[in-house]
């Protein structure tokens, strides 16, 4: 895993340099069109479920109803935010998470802390490796496949990891981003919540 960490650091620095103009432009656009804060921050489970703060570009407003409840995602997602998501630009701040060691470039996506007690024993194995910006599930359906299938693919990655597999995933990710494939579930602007799929791990 030392090779994986060295590659993550080198690639993250390189990608931050290459995308610096895009990042700065996006910061300006988000601040102008959506407002502050520019970054969306949320606590997610990392390696072995240890919490860390995930960074993304903000794509939604904080509009609320008369009772103070957030409006549905499809209402709060702006046209600017939709474009940022389509181009996967919202994920670029996660390169900072890679530098910090919270994320790897490749690994199971970090989901919500609320999901931890809902996993089966097998599904929980996805946390045996560091989470990533992209992963085996992302190039095999992303948000267009079921939660159970995603977790199955995540565990397959854990059991079959190799440096060359990571390179393959990164190359295929570039193609997926270019064609904007599988970004959202049908009729959902964000992934539908996971509510469990059987006997959970103790």
Swiss-Prot record:
Function, as annotated: May be involved in the production of the exopolysaccharide (EPS) component of the extracellular matrix during biofilm formation. EPS is responsible for the adhesion of chains of cells into bundles.
Protein name per its UniProtKB record: Uncharacterized sugar transferase EpsL
Regions crossing the membrane: 10-30
Membrane-topology descriptor: Single-pass membrane protein
Alphabetized InterPro entries for the sequence: Bact_transf (IPR003362)
Top-level taxon: Bacteria
Major localization class: membrane
GO biological process entries: polysaccharide biosynthetic process
Induction annotation: Repressed by SinR.
Sequence similarity: Belongs to the bacterial sugar transferase family.
Compartments in which it is found: Cell membrane
Protein EC: 2.-.-.-
Molecular-function GO terms, alphabetical: phosphotransferase activity, for other substituted phosphate groups
Alphabetized UniProt keyword annotations: Cell membrane, Exopolysaccharide synthesis, Membrane, Transferase, Transmembrane, Transmembrane helix
A cellular-component GO term for this protein: plasma membrane
Taxon lineage: Bacteria, Bacillati, Bacillota, Bacilli, Bacillales
